[in-house]
Amino acid sequence: MSVSYFQERGTPASGDVLSPATTSLGGASRGANALSSRITSVLSASYADLEIRDALETLDTRGVRNTAETRRQIRLDVQKEVIECNGEIVKDFGQVAEQLKRIGTAISSLNSYCADMRSHIAAANKETGPVLEEATGLINQRKQVESKQQILQAFNSHFLISDEEATVLTSTAEPVNEEFFQVLTRVKKIHHDCQVLLGTEDQRLGLEILEQSSKQLNAAFQKLYRWIQREFKTLDLENPQISASVRRSLRVLAERPTLFQSCLDSFAEARESILSDSFHSALTGSASDAEHIATKPIEFQAHDPLRYVGDMLAWVHSTTVSEREALENLFISDGDEIKRSIQEGLESEPWLKDEEAEIFDGRKALSQLVGRDLASVARVLRQRTEQVVQSHDDATLAYKIANLIGFYKGMFAKLLGTDSDVLEVFTTLEASAMRQFRANMRDYVAAVQSDIAVPPQDLSPPDFLDDALQTLKVLAKSYDTSSAGAEDQEQGFQAVLAEALDPFMSGCVNLQKGLQQPDSAVFAINCLFAAKDVLSAFTFASERVEEMEDTISEQVAQLVDYQHEYLLHESGLATLLEALEPITDDEESLKTIPELEPFKRDALVAASQQLDEFLPSALIDAAENLKRLKNRKMIQDITEEAAASFCEDFEVVESKIIAADDLTYDEDKEDEEQEPGLRDLFPRTSGEIRVLLS
C-alpha cells in the first residue's frame, strides 16, 4: 500500500512541474530540487527503520485507505488528534495543580503545628533536663552497685567458705565423708586461685585469703591424718572389701608427703607387729582364733629339717603375696593417683624435694612397704633357719636348704624387687647354708682322705667315690629342681662340683699314681665312667661331662699304646721292627737286611715260630690285660685298635723282607740251587695276620 501511495503522489507532481501555469523558472527549479530531495530521502529510508515501521503500523490499525481524499486530509487529521490529546493533558494537569495547592495548604498548616510542638518540647526539655540527668546518674550508680554486688557475691562464693563448711573441714567431731572431700577440693582450688589475687597491685586481700586457706588446709590434712590412723588400727587387710573412703583418704593425704610418710611408718609398724604375731602363731599353734584351729603348727615338722624350713618359707611367701595384693588394693587400685598426689605435694613443699632423688615409683614404694611389714618375720625366719642349718652336719641337707632358699629368693625378687631388705635376709641365709655345706663336705673329704690306702683289687671305683657320687646325684637333683629355667644354671653348678666331686676325683688320682699300666688307666677310666654316668643325666653338667670324655679318651689312648706294645713284644715282632729302624728304602740299605742279627736264619725261624704260637690266642691274651675294665665294649674297641696298629707294623716288616728277597734273588740259578730267602723263613702274610686278629 505504501508503494502505490508514493506512485499516486508522484503523478500530479510530475504534471505540476510540466504545467505552463507554474511560477518562474528559479522557483520551479528550487521546488523541483526540494521535492527531489524529499523523494530521495523517502526512497532511501530503510523499511527496517523503527520510526517508519511504527508509522506504517499506525496507519494500518486506523484502516486508512489510499485515496486522494485521505491523502489530503491525513495531515490535518493527525494534527487534530495531537491538539485534542494536548488539551486532555492540560486538563489533567489542571486538576493536579488544584490538588497540589490543597496539599501546599495542608503542609503549611502542618509546619505551623510542628513549630508549636517544637516550642512546647523545647520548654519541656528545659524544665525536665536536670531531672533526667539526675535519673541517668542514679541509674548508672545502680548498675555499678549491682555489678559490684555480683562481683562480691562471686568473690565470696569462690574465695570464701561458710562456717558450716569450715566445721566440716576442720572439726574432728565431723566425719570424713564425701562432703569433707568436696569442701577440701574447694579450699585447695581457693588456695591455688589466690595466685591471681597476688598478681594485683594490692596484694593484701590475696595474702589474707592465702593465709586463711593454708590454715584450713593444714587443719583438714591433720584431721584426715588422724582419721586414717584410727582406721588403720581396725583395718582388716584380709577383707577384700576395703573401704573406698580409706583409699581415697590415702590418695588425698599423699599431697602432704610428710604426713603420708608418717602414716605409712605407723602403718608399717602395726603390720609388722601383726605379721610377727601371725608367724609365731603359725609356728607354735598358739593362735586363739578359729582360723588356725585346723592347721598344724609348723614346729610339728621340726624333726624333718627340710620340710620345717620349707613350711616356714612357704608361709612367708604366702603371707607376702597376700600382703602385697591387699596393699595394692589399698594404695594402687586407683592407678597412679597417689603418685600424682605426691608429686603435687613435693611441688607445694619444695624444701622436702631432693634434687638427686628418683621420681616416685608407686610399685617400688609398695614393695618397700611390704618389706618393712615383713621385717620381724624375716628376722625370726633367719634365726630359725640358721639354727636348723648349724645343728646338722649333713652336707646334703645343708645344700638342699640352700637351694630351697635360693628358689624362694627368686620368687621374692619378682614380688618385692632386687633391692628389698627381705631379699638380703634370703641372700644371707643362702650364703650361710652354702658355707655349712662346704664345711661339712670338707670335713667328710678330710675323713675320707685319712682312710684312703689302696684302690680295690678289681680296680672298680672306691667306696668313697661311690658314696660321693650318690651324694652328688642327690645334690644335682636338688639343684635341678630349684634352678629350673635359670640362665646361668651350668655355671652355678660348678661350685657344687668343686665341693662334692673334685676332692674325691683328686683322691682317685692319688690312688692311680701308685698303679702301673694298664691298671692305672683302667682304674682311671672306671672312676671317670662312674662319675660321667651320674652327671650325664643333668644338662647343666654337660661341660664337666665333656671334660671327662676328653680325659677318658686320653686314658684309652694310653691303653691302646699298651696293648700295641704287648702285641709287638709277645709276637716277637718288636725285635724285627727295632732292627729295621735304620733301614731305608734304597737298595744298598735293603741288601743289608739278611745280615742283621734278627734276620739271620736261626733267629728269623725262631721269630716265625714265636709268631705262630702267639697268633691263635693273641686277642684273648690281650683282652685279659683289660679284664678289670668295666666297659666291655671299650675292651674290644681298644684291643681291635691295637691289633690294627700291629697289622700295620707287620706290613712294614713284610714289605722290607720282600724287598730284600727281590734284591738277593739270583735269576741264573735254579730254584733248587737258591738259598732259602727271608720270605721262606718268615712265611706269614699280612692278610693272614688280619684274618687271625679280626
Swiss-Prot record:
It is found in: Golgi apparatus membrane. It is a peripheral membrane protein. One of its GO terms (biological process) is protein transport. The keyword Transcription does not apply. Residues 1-20 are annotated as: Disordered. Coiled coil: none annotated. Its main location: Golgi. One of its GO terms (cellular component) is Golgi membrane. Transmembrane segments: none annotated. It holds the Pfam family COG6_C. Keywords: Golgi apparatus, Membrane, Protein transport, Transport. Belongs to the COG6 family. PANTHER family: COMPONENT OF OLIGOMERIC GOLGI COMPLEX 6, CONSERVED OLIGOMERIC GOLGI COMPLEX SUBUNIT 6. Acts as a component of the peripheral membrane COG complex that is involved in intra-Golgi protein trafficking. COG is located at the cis-Golgi, and regulates tethering of retrograde intra-Golgi vesicles and possibly a number of other membrane trafficking events. This is Conserved oligomeric Golgi complex subunit 6. It comes from Phaeosphaeria nodorum (strain SN15 / ATCC MYA-4574 / FGSC 10173).
